[in-house]
Amino acid sequence: REVGANTVRLAHYQHSPYFYDACDRAGLVVWAEIPFISVMNPAPGAHENCRSQMKELIVQNYNHPSICFWGISNEITIGGERPGLLDNLRDLNALAHEMDKTRMTTIAHVSMVPMENDMHHITDVLSYNHYFGWYGGELENNEQWLDKFHALHPDRPLGISEYGAEGIVSYHSDTPKCKDYTEEYQAVYHEHLAKVIDERPWLWATHVWNMFDFGCDARDEGGVKGRNNKGLMTLDRKIRK
């Protein structure tokens, strides 16, 4: 509420009923999804596991009015596109619609997915995870990419499922620049993206990554091990960046 948010995209796993209850009370629009991420396991049992998790996600949370979108995967081609992926995604999309005819389906693409791709035509709406101005490229690439995609696919509902930059509260600079991990660059980044988003009302939704810093064992960035510092607040929820 304090940041003016009206929607939440949940991370790629099952969440506590407490959080869904809180979103119901707050009137937030929720995107809930299964942990089908990064790369597809081609084993038949793996897809059955995905189907099982989709069924459980919907059955357990069907009655939460805050949930408006079921997500079928996140950055599933970051490890390469495997044979059978499109069929698996289509099957998960059909399963979600079979179990719940009232809600839309969505997908979060990794930035490298081409603008012309069959995955764009599976779910009801689609979004991209873009980090231009952080992991690569320039800040201005955000609006350039969005406008080009919209020109190519004016009838496809496009959103941003992730965007962000890391800021460590003890790092500061009078001349902030990309990858310096300062609060100042994080502010420059988000001020730019806020303007980009505001000027494009055709974006169906935008979701910042992330509301809070969070633990991640594999990470070692900015001199801080085991933590992703993209949060708008610190890990302990005490400091607003």
Positions of PLM-derived features:
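Extended substrate-binding grooves/exosites of carbohydrate-active enzymes
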Residues: 1-241
